[in-house]
């Protein structure tokens, strides 16, 4: 009798504990997967791969998107209104070409019309092992398959650590995710405000001396190119325009990168499609003012990239930024990149824009709307 009573009490305590954990996880929704109908979400931990795809599928008529942007956290801040099309930002932390293939097929299979795909690439596109990303619960994809998606929901509901994280991170700066508009992530305004308070001090921050380095997986190099070939074939089959661009790298990171491998990748990439390249030595990559750290350019720079790639060219204040690489100029382009890097002086004086110049840049107002 005592043992039965013990097990009954144990079972009840366990059940109540699990019920509390499930309820709290659903309520706090650390990864945003249970409240995808919200149009604006404040979160730094949103699972973009899951939430955005579900959002597009469930709201394809109201969103009316016929154009989509894929890429890593470097494209998350891009305001897709700039494209002049109804474009949805499907960028995700460590977003890779595998995400694009999976999601574009889901959309096509669900009858969503696609006119244009924008694909943002960077060094992590051909460095990082996607299996480590796809197995990370923070980044797991929406599969549009009932059994697999229910399994994901269950994992999120039953994780006590999520409740702990919500408590620990309460009060921290939260970015705004415009899920109901265009999927863009907006950096907390305090971050931009703090930069502008003392620009002279900011550009001398020691963080800009530390390169961003990824673990290299040699398999991913060919895998990334194979993925892009497959995406290109999908686009040709369904009469979709494909626009590829290579994101800028802060010079500290660029100097630490494998130049030979990067140029080899670009020479293979151009066989698949011509592309815009914003990396290399230029006005933006060489000046700390345009960066949050040595990995992510500031939001208004992200907008300029998309403005150029989409062909709108409404943002005109950024000089010497972006080269259109084709099979005809790729060899000369790569050779010049090597020469420019060898000639670059990392100790050059940092350019600091005037207050008037900064006012034009950071307002993000030179748009066609």
Roles of regions detected by a PLM:
Residues 8-26:
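Hydrophobic membrane-insertion alpha-helices, especially the h-region
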Residues 27-51:
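Alpha-helical transmembrane signal-anchor/signal-peptide segments
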Residues 43-69:
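Short extracytoplasmic
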Residues 49-56, 97-105, 226:
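N-terminal post-signal-peptidase region of extra-cytosolic proteins
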Residues 64, 69-152:
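Membrane-embedded segments
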Residues 121, 130-236, 321-369:
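Secreted/periplasmic serine-hydrolase-like ester/acetyl group-modifying domain
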Residues 202-289:
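Flexible, glycine-rich surface segments
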Residues 258, 263-369:
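C-terminal regions of proteins
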